[in-house]
UniProtKB/Swiss-Prot annotation:
Molecular functions per Gene Ontology: DNA binding
Location within or outside the cell: Host nucleus
Name the record gives this protein: Major viral transcription factor
Top-level lineage group: Viruses
Listed Basic and acidic residues bias regions: 988-1007
PTM comment text: A long stretch of serine residues may be a major site of phosphorylation.
């Protein structure tokens, strides 16, 4: 009760401080008034009907300024006041003294009140006359305050009252009975408390002061009815036209929001103001007949002023930024973030009696210098409507006669009508956090918070992590509400939003410094997810709409619902909050217009506000266009078709027109995107282009095929959106009404995405055909042609792209050209859409098309002679014209031509081929060969198949550069080859048919599209396609798992029939097809496959190898080298434990034959390339076969994301799947060629294809196959290459020492030329060239081409992307280890992996040669530089003579002593020459 009784105290004290009323003068004046200083002879000029500062004319525009922090109020003089019935609330019955109060009029106390006001003004500026303009008082008063008058000349505006008498002291005079006591206190928690009796007095004061002109006599709290002045309802509602209400009772005062004459605000009488009342005017009296006591008059006066100011503050919007307040008005009392902005004027007295002031945080500037930072804000997310209504109220003062706030949404309060607990702003330096009313220290100065605040200020979408220090939460709340209504994954984003690096740092910062110090994981924070602001902001604003994100996030966090149930709850929340988020009346207008319909002035202002930039007409048009798009493509068309008359069949549009409409929609989408990119300057600035916001199709493809009108409407709507965006770009800077905000642009993008995802199946998910048919490109191509052709091509393009007219359209009875865009006459025409190329608007020709117009010939079924139509074959025709070739028209492929083949005889078209079929209607190259891309699945045969090529950007009937090659198969009349692929049967696929077997459940890789899953090949065709010796019988079932592979094989079956009754021709096994099918010969039996390695080869890399074209007899092109992207060469180098460089044997450019991977195949490892035939089918076949046998397949994926094929294999999570990056940059010699000390080092981690991944794979293999031999992936024996060496052009390396001696030494047996022997055997060559053994002594010991093993540095995930060697932070000892280490070739040695963060714990291995057999140092040639690696004991370089043949030993031990013990026996080498000059000392056969 105590909190309810002191409601008036803070407002009274705020008013006193805002008007520079000092505490001491006011106390003295109030005491003097209560003690009864009276002058009966003086008339009551203050409370007469003079329309100046009377209770009946309370000044509505009394200046109000931002208040300073309130301080404890002093107790009234005289000690505790005795309670009177008028001041008692619900304390008890009236006292006898109050009952005996006389009802006769008492002497007028006006002189005492005038003296009090005189004393107050004298205390503010004693003896200084009028206050200087521009000065600021300590209390923060307004220098331009009209109340601050000259204290030497006037006591009150318009009052001739004499100066205050000298006898009027606070302690003098005969005291009058005190009927009411004022208790002034502060609502701040720091104010001092009063005694219980004083608080009771204050309660009575607040009870009467919190009442309004139209409230009831009693409060909800049960306070007793107290006699107090009541105003006249009529007087409050209908003031006098002249501005003077006339004589009225003293308790009458205007209602909040009533109009006030200008003289009342300025403090001086205007010419139009009424004259002061005569001195004999009756003094105001109580309703019971008694006059108001002086203290009660002060209370009522100040109460009226407070209520009037509160009402005007709530009614009046904030002036625009940078403009000063009007004369007589001051800025708002508080900034918008420190005061509730709800419309409290028309609410109950509880709502208007708790303004909740916020402590001032900075020094108050004078009113004329204070910046206008407050913004008029409503508790509504529709800020445009609120701003328009506020502007209407400001521009139409006459609208104040209506009830204030009728156009504002009622704030959400407690059931008892009170503000929510904890709605008060947090104390200075703290922000909301935790439960109701709790807070924490603010962290505004932390760098993470500063960066987050800057990102929040620039963000257009909701930020994933929000803290109160980032700023006003209104923007975040509105963005969250918008996202809940617009995003498909709203709940997922609220619960698990994707965090960038900066947002992740902010989330970690909040967890460490905000959440962690305050308790366990279930403590109350006020927001259930990171993006949500504290719920206290919504409670303080009373905005029920802001609770929507909290409700959605709470459901998203719950584990008691599954995804479908949560989706239902989200849809329910959207429907429940829809009217609140997007308010509209019955006529579809915003709330602001419907709310002010009863007030003409506000209605006119609100109607005018619709033309403001906040609610422009283009935004409405954007929304209407989006609505039309959704309605045109929606599934309701199917229901309308089903409701047609029974027995009638709706006409189905032709496939040609559907394709025309699809291309038109594609071009319309592209036009909108171009306009958006020009408007915003880039795709990143266009809102809505987010993968998470891609909508689902509006209807299935089958419903779209029966809705051509919807396609046309959607295309027209998109072009309207394009025009709106262009107007915004061209006129937005000069005319704000044409601007489009982020919400409108997001809606436009969404309209384009809805059309795109719906029409995509109609154009076969390919926009190339529509781009090729853009009419503007045809004109552009014409004007860019050579000078001899520019005139003719431009004229042809202009004539063919002429706009269609009604006169050009043929009637149904006349034989003529087709209507616009090639559709039938009965189906209408797309007259409002841009023309597509080629279009025939009615041009007729009776002759054969010339070379300038090679076209198919269309014929009408009802006409006589077939009329020809002219089109242009674009790219091929231009190329042919430039060469001066003559073309012959080919056979037309169109529905009209197929319907009437009599008009397309062979005599009329000599260049056509009789066996041209629709299935082969694909482009041909210069050699006449068909392209080898697979045929696309089609659900319809016949006419629809004939247009599959035109939708992809080329004209199947266009001429080619050279005549096509003759067919190897002669088709019989009427024979037509069957289509390899077709739609999935309705009854389901046959188990022997060709189709995708996608596993159920979750997969490691993306699942294929519906179109790929719908492709089907009949079992009889499958058996005929795979029955070929090129495909091993054990692997043929894998082909049935890949319809794309079957289509590729069918495209190659162009030879004569293999046997009688065959439907297809014999398969022509070309070289490329053999290379793509070579993987089937790696492992004969699919049951033996245990590990599958997936990779993406570079250009011209394959396991068949071959001589490059630069060599005689070579046919293979040299592969391209890439430092960034790894292919087959990088894969084999990693599996073979060696370094890949461009000059090494490991690169495919140096191969002269196929690499040998039989050692890997023997372990059950299958290497599969994305370019191999049936790549997808093989993986899914192995997964199905091994999974059926309860075995798990180990899949190592080295394919990059951009190289993963569309509709690639779906690998079930039942199997083991490991993915790593494959790149040559793992070798330090490739990444940092200048770092010589790291030339033999290779980086590795679990994310790189190398020993880090292989260790995981080997461990998994050991668990899957414990009885099998361990998997050995990183061994030199796994891979062997075929390269050019001195042993032959196609030498398999490494060549074993025995085989090396057998192949090389006989060639030099008996040779007398020692120089030729030295050069042939490589006596003077470096021991190792690019890592491979090259010299004679190295080849004789380890084998020719045996490679040095690298040192692997485990760098972790971050080190794998290091740009500079310094980023690795390699210890100095480890760097020295890599420089001197020389790991000799060993086919079975495991990889040497060293952690990059530690120094090595062993000595670097080196190679030691036996003394007396040449140099003890090992020469290594790398990147054109030779390096000499010395043994450990040698300190200086040893130089030997030329021509020495040495015996070698190994030094593998940790110390020289151990090395001598483990030294091998000398290897004997045959004498290579019997020359006497050579000497016998190096002959190992001599003792």
């Amino acid at each position: 009760m105590a909190s309810q009784r002191s409601d008036f105290a803070p407002d009274l004290y705020d008013f006193i401080e805002s008007n520079d009323f000092g505490e001491d003068p006011l106390i003295r004046a109030a005491s003097a008034a209560e003690e009864g200083f009276t002058q009966p002879a003086a008339p009551d000029l203050l409370y007469g009907s003079q329309n100046m500062f009377g209770v009946d004319d309370a000044p509505l525009s009394t200046p109000v300024v931002v208040i300073p922090p309130p301080s404890p109020a002093p107790e009234p003089r005289g000690g505790k006041a005795k309670r009177s019935p008028s001041a008692a609330g619900s304390g008890g019955p009236p006292t006898p003294a109050a009952a005996a109060q006389p009802a006769s009029p008492a002497p007028s106390p006006a002189p005492g009140l005038a003296a009090m006001l005189k004393m107050v003004h004298s205390s503010v500026a004693p003896g200084n006359g009028r206050r200087a303009t521009g000065s600021s008082s300590p209390g923060g008063g307004d220098a331009a305050d009209p109340v601050a008058l000259d204290s030497d000349t006037e006591t009150c505006p318009g009052s001739p009252q004499p100066e205050f008498p000298s006898s009027a002291s606070p302690g003098g005079g005969s005291p009058a009975p005190r009927v009411r006591s004022i208790s002034i206190s502060s609502s701040s928690s720091s104010s001092s408390s009063m005694d219980e009796d004083d608080q009771a007095d204050g309660a009575g004061a607040s009870s009467s002061s919190s009442s309004s002109s139209d409230d009831s006599d009693s409060d909800e709290g049960g306070e007793e009815e107290t006699p107090r002045p009541r105003h006249s309802q009529n007087a409050a509602k209908t003031p006098s036209a002249a501005g003077s209400p006339g004589p009225s009772s003293g308790g009458d005062r205007p209602a909040a929001g009533a109009a006030t004459p200008k003289s009342c605000r300025s403090g001086a009488a205007s010419p139009g103001a009424p004259a002061p009342a005569p001195a004999s005017a009756p003094a105001p009296s109580r309703p019971g007949g008694g006059l108001l006591p002086p203290g009660a008059r002060i209370l009522e006066y100040l109460e009226g002023v407070r209520e009037a100011n509160l009402a005007k503050t709530l009614e009046r919007p904030e002036p625009p930024a940078g403009m000063a307040s009007p004369p007589g008005r001051s800025p708002h009392r508080l900034p918008k973030d420190q005061r509730p902005k709800s419309a409290l004027a028309g609410a109950s007295k509880r709502k208007r009696a708790n303004p909740r002031p916020r402590p001032q945080t900075q020094t108050q500037a004078p009113a004329e210098e204070a910046p206008q930072t407050a913004v008029w804000d409503l508790l509504d997310m529709n800020s445009s409507q609120a701003t328009g209504a506020a502007a209407a109220a400001a521009s139409a003062p006459a609208a104040a006669s209506c009830a204030p706030g009728v156009y504002q949404r009622e704030p959400l309060l407690t059931p008892s009508g009170d503000p929510w607990p904890g709605s008060d702003p947090p104390p200075m330096g703290r922000v909301r956090y935790g439960g109701t009313g709790d807070s924490r220290d603010g962290l505004w100065d932390d760098p993470e918070i500063v960066l987050a605040a800057s990102r929040y200020a620039e963000a257009q979408a909701p930020v994933p992590v929000f803290v109160p220090e980032m700023g006003d939460s209104t923007k975040q709340y509105n963005a969250l509400v918008r996202m809940v209504f617009e995003s498909r994954e709203a709940m997922s984003w609220l619960q698990n939003s994707k965090l960038s690096g900066q947002d992740q740092n902010l989330a970690q910062f909040c967890q460490k410094f905000i959440h962690a110090p305050r308790g366990h994981g279930s403590f109350i924070t006020g927001s259930v997810a990171n993006p949500l602001p504290h719920i206290g902001d919504a409670m303080a604003a009373g905005n029920a709409l802001w609770a929507l994100p909290h409700a959605a996030a709470s459901v998203a966090m719950s584990r008691r619902y599954d995804r479908t149930q949560k989706s239902f709850i989200l849809q329910s929340l959207r429907r429940a909050y829809a009217d609140m988020a997007y308010p509209r009346d019955e006529a579809g207008r915003p709330d602001s217009l419907a709310a002010v319909a009863g007030c003409p002035a506000q209605a006119a202002a609100a109607a005018a506000s619709q033309q403001q930039p906040e609610a422009p007409a283009p935004s409405v048009r954007v929304r209407e266009a989006y609505t039309r798009v959704c309605a045109a493509l929606g599934p309701r068309r199917k229901a309308a078709a089903a409701a047609a008359a029974p027995g009638t069949r709706a006409p189905r549009p032709s496939a040609f027109r559907l394709r025309e409409l699809g291309d038109a929609c594609v071009l319309a989408c592209q036009a909108v995107f171009e306009a958006l990119l020009r408007l915003r300057g880039g795709a990143s600035a266009v809102p809505g282009l987010d993968p998470s916001e891609i909508p689902s199709p509006a209807c299935p493809p089958e419903a779209l095929c029966s809705n051509p009108a919807g396609l046309e409407t959607a295309a027209l709507s998109l072009y309207e959106l394009r025009d709106l965006v262009e107007r915004a770009r061209l006129l937005g800077d000069s005319d704000p009404t044409h601007r489009l905000g982020s919400d409108e642009l997001r809606l436009a993008v969404r309209a384009v995405l809805v059309v795109a995802r719906t029409v995509a199946p109609l154009v076969r998910y390919n926009a190339e055909g529509a781009r090729a048919r853009a009419s503007a490109w045809t004109v552009t191509q014409a004007v860019f042609s050579i000078p001899s052709l520019v005139g003719g091509m431009l004229g042809e393009a202009v004539s063919l792209l002429a706009p269609p007219t009604r006169s050009q359209q043929p009637s149904s009875s006349s034989p003529g050209g087709e209507p616009f865009s090639g559709s039938a006459a009965a189906e209408g025409s797309l007259q409002t859409l841009p023309p597509l190329w080629p279009t025939v608007p009615g041009k007729q020709s009776a002759t054969v098309p010339s070379s300038h117009s090679q076209s198919p010939q269309h014929s009408q079924s009802g006409g006589g002679a077939g009329a020809t139509t002219a089109t242009c074959c674009r790219a091929t025709q231009t190329n042919a014209r430039s060469r001066g070739q003559q073309h012959q028209p080919q056979k037309a492929r169109s529905p009209q031509a197929a319907a009437s083949p009599a008009h397309l005889s062979q005599e009329a078209m000599p260049g056509s081929s009789s066996d041209d079929r629709a299935i082969h209607g694909r482009p041909r190259g210069k050699s006449g060969k068909r392209r080898s891309e697979p045929l696309e699945p089609a659900a319809q045969a016949g006419a629809s198949a004939s247009f599959s090529s035109s939708a992809r950007g080329y004209d199947p009937s266009g001429p080619v550069d050279s005549p096509p090659a003759p067919k190897r198969r002669v088709a019989t009349p009427g024979h037509q080859a069957p289509r390899a692929l077709g739609p999935m049967p309705a009854e389901g696929p046959d188990r022997r048919g060709g189709f995708r077997r996608v596993p159920r459940g979750d997969c490691h890789t993306p699942r294929p599209s519906d179109a790929a899953c719908a492709a089907y090949c009949p079992p009889e065709l499958v058996a005929e396609l795979i029955d070929n010796q090129l495909f091993p019988e054990a692997w043929r079932p894998a082909l049935t798992f890949d319809p794309q592979a079957l289509a590729t094989i069918a495209a190659r079956c162009s030879g004569p029939p293999a046997r009688d009754g065959a439907r297809l021709g014999e398969l022509a096994a070309s070289g490329p097809l053999r290379r793509r099918a070579a993987w089937m010969h790696q492992i004969p039996d699919p049951e033996d496959v245990k590990v599958v390695v997936l990779y993406s080869p570079l250009q011209d890399e394959d396991l068949l190898g071959g001589l490059p074209a630069s060599r005689p007899g070579g046919s293979r092109r040299e592969p391209l080298w890439s430092d960034l992207k790894g292919g087959l060469s990088a894969l084999l180098a990693a599996l073979g434990n060696r370094i890949l460089t461009k000059r090494s044997h490991a690169w495919a450019g140096n191969w002269t034959g196929a690499p040998d991977v039989s050692a890997l195949n023997a372990q059950g490892v299958l290497l599969l390339s994305t370019g191999d035939l049936a790549f997808t089918g093989c993986v899914e076949y192995l997964c199905l076969r091994l999974g059926s046998a309860r075995r798990k397949l180990l899949v190592l994926d080295a394919v990059s994301t951009e190289d993963w094929p569309q509709d690639g294999p779906a690998i079930s999570q039942y199997h083991i799947y490991m993915r790593a990056a494959l790149t040559p940059r793992v070798a330090c010699a490739v990444r940092w060629p200048g770092e010589r000390h790291l030339s033999r080092a290779v980086l590795t981690s679990s994310t790189l294809f190398g020993p880090g991944l292989f260790a995981r794979a080997e461990a998994a293999f050991a668990r899957l196959y414990p009885d099998s031999a361990p998997l050995r992936l990183c061994r030199s024996s796994n891979v062997a290459y075929t390269v050019d060496t001195r042993a032959g052009e196609r030498t398999r390396v490494p060549l074993a020492p025995r085989e090396y001696r057998q192949r090389v030494l006989p060639d030099y047996d008996g040779c007398k030329d020692m120089r030729a022997q030295a050069e042939g055997l490589g006596f003077h060559d470096p021991d190792f060239e690019e890592g491979a053994a090259q010299s004679h002594r190295a080849a004789n010991r380890w084998g020719l081409g045996a490679w040095l093993r690298p040192v692997y540095l485990a760098c972790g995930r971050r080190g794998a992307g290091a740009v500079e060697p310094s980023e690795l932070l390699i210890p100095e000892l480890l760097s020295e280890f890599c420089r001197v280490a020389l790991l000799e070739p060993d086919a079975e040695a495991e990889p040497l992996v060293l952690p990059i963060t530690e120094a090595p714990r062993r000595r670097a291995p080196r190679v030691d040669w036996e003394p007396g057999f040449g140099s003890r140092s090992t020469s290594v040639l790398h990147m054109g530089a030779t390096e000499l690696c010395l043994p450990e004991p040698d300190d200086e370089l040893e130089i030997d003579g030329a021509g020495d043949v040495e015996l070698v030993v190994e030094h593998p031990g940790p110390s020289p002593g151990v090395a001598q013990a483990l030294r091998r026996a000398p290897i004997k080498i045959e004498v290579v020459s019997d020359d006497e000059d050579g000497g016998d000392w190096c002959n190992p056969y001599l003792s």
